[in-house]
Amino acid sequence: VAYPAMSGYGTAAGDDPVQTAVWRLRSRACWADAAALLEPVTAGAALQRASLLVERCLYTEQGWAEAEDALRTAEALARSDDERGAAACERGQLAYAATLLGVRDRADEARAALGRAAALIAPGAPGRALLDFRRGLLAENLAHSPQAARAAYRRAHAGATAQDDALLLSFTWRHLAGLALREGELAEARHGFTESLRIREELGYLVGTAPALASLADAEIEPEASRLRAEAARLFRLLGGVPTWLAPRLAPPAATA
């Protein structure tokens, strides 16, 4: 089984015991423990370590200073265009997370960093699909442009399919389904959310399973919607309330008069 790193850099972990341990910790919301297993002495290790700590920020709304320090180390060690592009992609994601979660408005920094990454990572390169996905996030959630977001997500989906990046596919399926749901395309939304959930369960990506369950619940009717939401809430509690932004979506719907 390949355990793709969120940075898109060195995506196949193979049978390396350290990478297997990193994946298991990451999938259980133990990003700091996973990062501690990586010595940032090479560009690849530094990038992977930074990506873990950036992901922790997005899921927990904590650890911003540690992520910034790890990112600076990765930027200093990056030599090739792909490495510099991957570091810029992580910087864009950190700025996006800070903006989305209301920590600080860094939208301009996010756009500039992902623009730099696009100039450095060639189409078809391993990190390009992840970059396209993150540009879609900016388009959807910061620029509020669903058409641009859909185009970016589709490019990311095609790239993830070509590179057999199952984890990234779980994200592209979910976000394309979210756009379909907003447009009232229930069958398309259910299909995408179901695929995302299936992949995450197969990979053992526990921290991403509760959001996938909650998303599918939004596209289902009762009693299935409540069953899915209850299972998402169980996993959410199991992981100590992570991701933090999921809590409002797990509250039972208000009773109607």
What does each of the following model-derived ranges do?
Residues V1-V22, R26, E202-A257:
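C-terminal non-catalytic interaction modules
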Residues D16, G44, Q48-S51, A86, ...:
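Residue register of alpha-helical TPR repeats
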Residues A12, L47, D82-C89, P126-R128, ...:
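Residue signature of alpha-solenoid helical repeat architecture, marking inter-repeat boundaries
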Residues A34, A67-A70, A74, A110-A117, ...:
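Tetratricopeptide repeat
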